[in-house]
Curated annotation (Swiss-Prot):
Gene3D superfamilies: plastocyanin oxidoreductase, Single helix bin. Its main location: plastid. InterPro entries: Cyt_b/b6_C (IPR005798), Cyt_b/b6_C_sf (IPR036150), Cyt_b6/f_cplx_suIV (IPR005870), Cytochrome_b_C_euk/bac (IPR048260). The chain crosses the membrane at residues 36-56, 95-115, 131-151. This is Cytochrome b6-f complex subunit 4. The 4 large subunits of the cytochrome b6-f complex are cytochrome b6, subunit IV (17 kDa polypeptide, petD), cytochrome f and the Rieske protein, while the 4 small subunits are petG, petL, petM and petN. The complex functions as a dimer. It comes from Anthoceros angustus. Belongs to the cytochrome b family. PetD subfamily. GO terms for molecular function: electron transporter, transferring electrons within cytochrome b6/f complex of photosystem II activity; electron transporter, transferring electrons within the cyclic electron transport pathway of photosynthesis activity; ubiquinol-cytochrome-c reductase activity. It is a multi-pass membrane protein.
Length: 160
């Protein structure tokens, strides 16, 4: 059962608009064939031409060649894995670290159900979800910054 709002044809303002032809697709330019055959291919081919042109005119180096016999002193993951890397690095029990990593998406899945009875969309009128979001963001930033530091300074961020 779909929820659609049917127009009120007894409304005189709507009837006047319909009498003028407004509210229907009787004005403007049709999408077929004008947009689909002429404008879209030009935009797509122009995007491809710009991408290929930039790749040919300004080839960027990938970086220094890899040396399989030299490993870096500390292997760091990509920046978006820093918070969970910090969890794995600081928790002594690795099983607990993996469970804490699995708790991150599980916790994110529970946030919408904490205030599902609240009908407001304004964050200031949803204090529980907003508080959880702000605390989670602060913890993720704290863990992310700590992952880039040596392990003895990672939890305090070198401030103490």
């Amino acid at each position: 059962m779909g929820v659609t709002k049917k127009p009120d044809l007894s409304d005189p303002v709507l009837r006047a608009k319909l009498a003028k032809g407004m509210g229907h697709n009787y004005y403007g330019e049709p999408a077929w064939p004008n947009d689909l055959l002429y404008i879209f291919p030009v935009v797509i081919l122009g995007t491809i031409a710009c991408t290929v042109g930039l790749a040919v005119l300004e080839p960027s180096m990938i970086g220094e060649p890899a040396n399989p016999f030299a490993t870096p002193l500390e292997i760091l993951p990509e920046w978006y894995f820093f918070p969970v890397f910090q969890i794995l690095r600081t928790v002594p029990n690795k099983l607990l670290g993996v469970l804490l990593m699995a708790a991150v998406p599980a916790g994110l899945l529970t946030v919408p159900f904490l205030e599902n009875v609240n009908k407001f969309q304004n964050p200031f009128r949803r204090p529980v979800a907003t508080t959880i979001f702000l605390i989670g963001t602060a913890v993720a930033i704290w863990l992310g910054i700590g992952a880039a530091l040596p392990i003895d300074k990672s939890l305090t961020l070198g401030l103490s």
